[in-house]
Structure formats: C-alpha cells, structure tokens
C-alpha cells in the first residue's frame, strides 16, 4: 500500500512539473484572419503579449505599441496583440472590424490575433499559462484590464508582466528588451 501511495505521489508530482515545464512555444493561436499561428515560430525572440481593446480609455496605447514595435522589431523583438471583450464590452467588434480599426486608426503592423477571452470560464489556453503560476512556473498574474503586458524571453519562458496603465515604454519593458 505504501508503494502505491508513493507511486501516486510521484505521478502527481511529475504531471505538475510537466505542466510547469510547458513553454510559450507549445501553444498555437489564430491570427485575426483565422490562420493558425504556432508560437514556436517566435523562438529566439522576446515577445510582448498584450490583450487589446478598441473602445477603452487605454486604446491609444496602440500607437505606443506600434512605435515600440517599429523601434525594436529588428532586434529579435515582437509584439502580439490579443483582442478581448472581457472588460465592460470594450472590444465588441468582429475580427474583421478589429483588423480594420487597428489598420485605419493606428497603422498597426505587429501581429494581431483572433479575438479571445483572457479571463473566466472560456479563457484561452495561452492566457491560462500566462496568468497561472502552476502553469508558467513563475507567478499568478490575472489580467486586471485591457492592455496588460506579458514579457516572454527568447526561450519561451515567462519573465513578468506590466500593469495595463503602464506605458509600453515603461522602464521595465525597455530594460527587458535591451537586456542582452
């Protein structure tokens, strides 16, 4: 009986460790136009993951995000935007409407993914990993509002997050991007 409990404990521990060992690169998401986008294609790049919305007081951050992307995209850095309608209905549009909004209003050229949920029962698997310590191995970081920013290193590891109201040009983000 003792051997059985030891086996079960070892199995639970190994499954827990396997979940923590999952990397950003293990996920595949969909682009705003519906194509599969394996995040493994970003190996070797620092990635800033941001949940975005077009009818939020923080929506002007799109301009800063684009400026940040333009400034660092040639230095193994990329931004990925995930439209989400989780906060007061501030992203009500379809994927097509969101893509048009980003292009017309902010000339966004960084990748925008298909609309997802970033909290609640229908939370996207990637956002479970981004927000749960038991999965990312680092920290619980529930999404507080639109434009929360998650930093992923060149090896697909969770580095940290920046609160929604903080500028994409915050010292935390810039020093992380520029760190060699």
Task: Locate each region found by the language model.
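Bacterial Sec-dependent N-terminal signal peptides
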Residues: 1-22
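Short, internal strand/loop/helix patches
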Residues: 23-24, 96-146
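Thiol-based oxidoreductase modules, predominantly thioredoxin-like and allied folds used
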Residues: 76-93, 108-120
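Conserved helix-turn-beta segment immediately C-terminal to the redox Cys motif
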Residues: 45-46, 55, 59-83, 103-106
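Thiol-/selenol-based redox modules, centered on thioredoxin-like
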Residues: 125-128, 132-180
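N-terminal "domain-start" segment that seeds a small globular fold
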Residues: 19-40, 124-125
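Amphipathic alpha-helical repeat scaffolds
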Residues: 31, 51-55
């Amino acid at each position: 009986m003792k051997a059985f409990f030891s086996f079960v404990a070892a199995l639970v521990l190994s499954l827990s460790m396997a979940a923590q060992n999952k990397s950003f690169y293990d996920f595949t998401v969909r682009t705003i136009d519906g194509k599969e986008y394996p995040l493994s294609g970003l190996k070797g790049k620092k990635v800033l993951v941001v949940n975005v919305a077009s009818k939020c007081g923080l929506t002007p951050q799109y301009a800063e995000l684009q400026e940040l992307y333009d400034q660092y995209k040639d230095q193994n850095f990329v931004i990925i935007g995930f439209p989400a309608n989780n906060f007061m209905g501030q992203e009500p549009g379809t994927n097509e409407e969101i893509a048009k909004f980003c292009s017309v209003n902010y000339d966004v050229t960084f990748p925008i993914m298909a609309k997802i949920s970033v909290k609640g029962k229908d939370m996207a698997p990637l956002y479970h990993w981004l927000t749960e310590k038991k999965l990312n191995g680092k920290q619980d970081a529930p999404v507080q509002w639109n434009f929360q920013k998650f930093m992923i290193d060149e090896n697909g590891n969770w580095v940290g997050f920046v609160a929604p109201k903080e500028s994409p040009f915050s010292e935390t983000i810039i020093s992380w991007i520029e760190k060699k």
